């Protein structure tokens, strides 16, 4: 498998990106890395490590897209940027996947404009998988589409369902609509209309509305919402997780008795920290485009980047894009028959 990597994306590029690539090359013997960025700079960063030189291809790119640039304008103008060149590798079928920890807006825009949408997809969606009390869950959309239509959300539900079936091996994923109440009549015009459409979808296991306080249980596999709500829920969840871990750490240090209990609690606390750590999950797939596109966290370190590559590899092994294309095409055909 060939993976295109934006070598200049993220807060700790290129060092963390390069180290993550080296770790991935060591762990996964069936991958090749095509890394984009200033070639001399990238080669210097790689020179600090031992790695299989036969499996790394350097693609020289002189420009970098920063987070404060207008996404669409930057993607269109900076054709020699590390991000655009990485995306073009997937567009031109030189790579099966692309990963970037750079500007989210530019990445999502570039995926749509350069890689292109799967035929029949109205809007691609950002779909991070998060740790829950009873298992992982997906938030879709988590920020790609701030303004959405009911038909978009129904398609998000279908894409999320396909993901859980093919990647997570869940036979009948539960799909819920994020709302301010469980009752069908609750919410705004968007959620009310979406609820009716999802209820009519016989091939989606729609369990109804899900209140925000129930999001983190993991009892519902796919949580559907527009990008504004999804991004808010995602950032709130990350913030609460960080706060809880910080509070536990402070309480442990607060008294002598608490410190005495640390050796007994340490394994459980370490396991909790691992479950809540975004680095373990790598990145969020951008579902609905023709290639495997993974958005890594902007502050990703080497471990997070290695896990983003692991994710992309798993998506490829499970033919996620092929299965999404098949389902969306089938759904579009069924809709045409019913017109």
Curated annotation (Swiss-Prot):
GO terms for biological process: fatty acid biosynthetic process; phospholipid biosynthetic process. It is found in: Cytoplasm. InterPro entries: FA_synthesis, Phospholipid_synth_PlsX-like. Pathway: Lipid metabolism; phospholipid metabolism. It catalyses: a fatty acyl-[ACP] + phosphate = an acyl phosphate + holo-[ACP]. Its main location: cytoplasm. Catalyzes the reversible formation of acyl-phosphate (acyl-PO(4)) from acyl-[acyl-carrier-protein] (acyl-ACP). This enzyme utilizes acyl-ACP as fatty acyl donor, but not acyl-CoA. This is Phosphate acyltransferase. The gene is plsX.
